């Protein structure tokens, strides 16, 4: 058994990042109540397994394309058979859903996200207009999942919304950067439909995320330390997207995409600061 191939199939780093997001989301929602750690560990394991299921499905459905573009991937390289990959993916989701029964609300969300992952892999990868929103939703949903695990989703809903709109913006920018390849692959995307105007759509979504970011302070969940931290992040967001709008080149799109990814992580730190120093 090639264990490394299984880790590659599920994209181990992505799974660890997602599970860490759920754990951090729960810590924020519980204001670092250590009594919730056991539930957060279970929630993180569920996210890891369901994320692995989704990533494995992507490789299963992308087999034809990967034979040409990524022949080193576990299935096209024959380090894993298609049958083994299928069995493993459904084992992951079965175990993940079983563990999620520790909390019925977590179970229902895990079922929902598993269905969304299956639909994305089978139907919406080539329709990025819908696919981008799905990716953004899945990215942000890990924070809500952590909040559900500890019984408080108020703050994590706001974190979810900020992450959703920031990641949605980033996905459109990435598509703008990859427009030629997507045309060859007959993919539907906002940049293919709208051209340079898609940069303005991405900018609008990111500005909306910035607009939402003060809500935890305004609603009294967090104090001034959060506000100061998130204003710094918002300025970085706005500078990056302004540079792209001013110069909508592929080079600037790459910079803007990287900037959003980095600053979104800084926003997560701002939420941590807000939770710690309320």
Curated annotation (Swiss-Prot):
Protein topology in the membrane: Multi-pass membrane protein
GO BP annotations, alphabetical order: glycerophospholipid biosynthetic process
Any single GO CC term annotated in Swiss-Prot or TrEMBL for this entry: plasma membrane
Entry keyword Nucleotide-binding: no
Keyword line: Cell membrane, Lipid biosynthesis, Lipid metabolism, Magnesium, Membrane, Phospholipid biosynthesis, Phospholipid metabolism, Transferase, Transmembrane, Transmembrane helix
Transmembrane segments: 12-32, 34-54, 91-111, 129-149, 153-173, 204-224, 225-245, 257-277
Reaction it catalyzes: sn-3-O-(geranylgeranyl)glycerol 1-phosphate + (2E,6E,10E)-geranylgeranyl diphosphate = 2,3-bis-O-(geranylgeranyl)-sn-glycerol 1-phosphate + diphosphate
Enzyme type, top EC level: transferase
One Pfam family cited in the UniProt record for this chain: UbiA
Gene3D superfamilies: UbiA prenyltransferase
Chief location bin: membrane
GO MF annotation terms: geranylgeranylglycerol-phosphate geranylgeranyltransferase activity; magnesium ion binding
Cellular localization per UniProt: Cell membrane
Pathway: Membrane lipid metabolism; glycerophospholipid metabolism
Keyword Lipid metabolism: yes
Family indicated by similarity: Belongs to the UbiA prenyltransferase family. DGGGP synthase subfamily.
Function text: Prenyltransferase that catalyzes the transfer of the geranylgeranyl moiety of geranylgeranyl diphosphate (GGPP) to the C2 hydroxyl of (S)-3-O-geranylgeranylglyceryl phosphate (GGGP). This reaction is the second ether-bond-formation step in the biosynthesis of archaeal membrane lipids.
Stated name of the protein: Digeranylgeranylglyceryl phosphate synthase
Species name: Methanococcus maripaludis (strain C7 / ATCC BAA-1331)
């Amino acid at each position: 058994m090639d264990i490394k191939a299984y880790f590659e199939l599920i994209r181990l780093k992505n799974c660890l990042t997602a599970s860490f997001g759920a754990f951090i989301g729960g810590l924020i929602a519980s204001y670092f109540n250590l009594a919730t750690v056991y539930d957060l560990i279970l929630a993180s394991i569920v996210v890891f397994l369901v994320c692995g299921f989704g990533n494995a499905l992507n490789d299963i459905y992308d087999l034809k394309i990967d034979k040409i573009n990524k022949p080193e991937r576990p299935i096209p390289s024959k380090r894993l058979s298609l049958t083994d990959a299928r069995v493993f993916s459904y084992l992951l989701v079965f175990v993940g859903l079983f563990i999620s029964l520790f909390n019925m609300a977590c179970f229902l969300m895990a079922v929902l996200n598993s269905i969304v992952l299956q639909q994305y892999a089978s139907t919406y990868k080539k329709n990025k207009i819908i696919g981008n929103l799905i990716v953004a939703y899945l990215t942000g949903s890990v924070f809500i999942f952590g909040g559900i695990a500890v019984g408080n989703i108020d703050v994590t809903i706001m974190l979810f919304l900020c992450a959703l709109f920031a990641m949605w913006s980033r996905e459109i920018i990435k598509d703008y950067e990859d427009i030629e390849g997507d045309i060859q692959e007959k993919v539907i995307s906002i940049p293919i439909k709208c051209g340079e105007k898609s940069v303005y759509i991405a900018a609008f979504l990111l500005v909306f995320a910035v607009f939402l970011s003060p809500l935890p302070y305004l609603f009294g969940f967090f104090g001034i330390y959060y506000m100061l931290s998130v204003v710094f992040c918002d300025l970085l967001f706005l500078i990056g997207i302004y540079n792209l709008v001013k110069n909508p080149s592929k080079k600037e799109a790459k910079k803007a995409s990287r900037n959003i990814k980095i600053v979104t992580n800084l926003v997560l730190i701002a939420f941590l600061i807000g939770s710690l120093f309320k």
